[in-house]
Amino acid sequence: MATPTPFQSQIYRSLPEIERADAIVERISKAIALGLLKVGERLPPEAALSEMFGVGGATLREALSELRERGVVETRRGRSGGTFVVNQPEPETDIMREWFLSTSISEIRDIGDEHSAIAAATIRLACERAEAHDFDRLQELARALVLAETPETRASADSRFHIELAVSAQSPRLANAEIRLQEETVRQLWAPFTVAEAYDPERATAEHLELVRAVAQDQPERAQKLTLEHIRRNIFHLIDTKLVLGYAQSRPSSPATAPDGSSSAEAAMIQEGQ
């Protein structure tokens, strides 16, 4: 079997002993949602998948059957056959809504703190270690976001950009941390029920492209500043969405504004920090 790529090593790593078929379904579905596996991409052969996941053939076939029933993959026969990704997983709107309602503002802020710490180190290493061919790829991924037309494909394009940027830093641990953080919040960021001023793909794309330019020009201070501002806006958006969902039955659907003109997210973070 060929040596797996870094992405394959993350997606197809060994599974826990319990509910292995369900774990495979979840792992592959999340990889597609994060953009690690793209629509049209062929999965490794079943024998290789079984070996990488550390499962028997029957368990793997059960998982692939479930993914086919969900319309996420299809298996084609013939010389050029195999199992191919054909669709994004269906959005788990109820689960995302419950995440907003059950996650406190302090917890969302803490996610932002962790992401800021990881991203600050990652972007500085990217300025040092990224290679020339990385920049064209990152620009292509940045532009893919504004071309995406659904919340699911926007979340996928967004996370794939940030993960590829982390990969360019050539630190597997930091790249894995970025994958984990993207998995935790990116679908909520682009959720279809977000606040009235929906998260803007054009603005996010512009920020991504500006970040690529800073890395390409080896400007670590500027790149870090842009990264932290980007994460801060993301966290404020998540908090705004939480507040809107939490107050939906008693307040207007548009996000509240504090007396000084700041967003409801800023006001809530200040209040919780006191």
Swiss-Prot record:
The keyword Protein biosynthesis does not apply. PROSITE patterns: HTH_GNTR. Residues 250-274 are annotated as: Disordered. GO terms for molecular function: DNA binding; DNA-binding transcription factor activity. The keyword Cytoplasm does not apply. InterPro entries: GntR_C, TF_FadR/GntR_C, Tscrpt_reg_HTH_GntR, WH-like_DNA-bd_sf, WH_DNA-bd_sf. Keywords: DNA-binding, Transcription, Transcription regulation. Residues 18-88 form the HTH gntR-type domain. May regulate the transcription of the rmpAB operon. This is Putative HTH-type transcriptional regulator RmpR. It comes from Mycobacterium gastri. The lineage of its organism: Bacteria, Bacillati, Actinomycetota, Actinomycetes, Mycobacteriales.
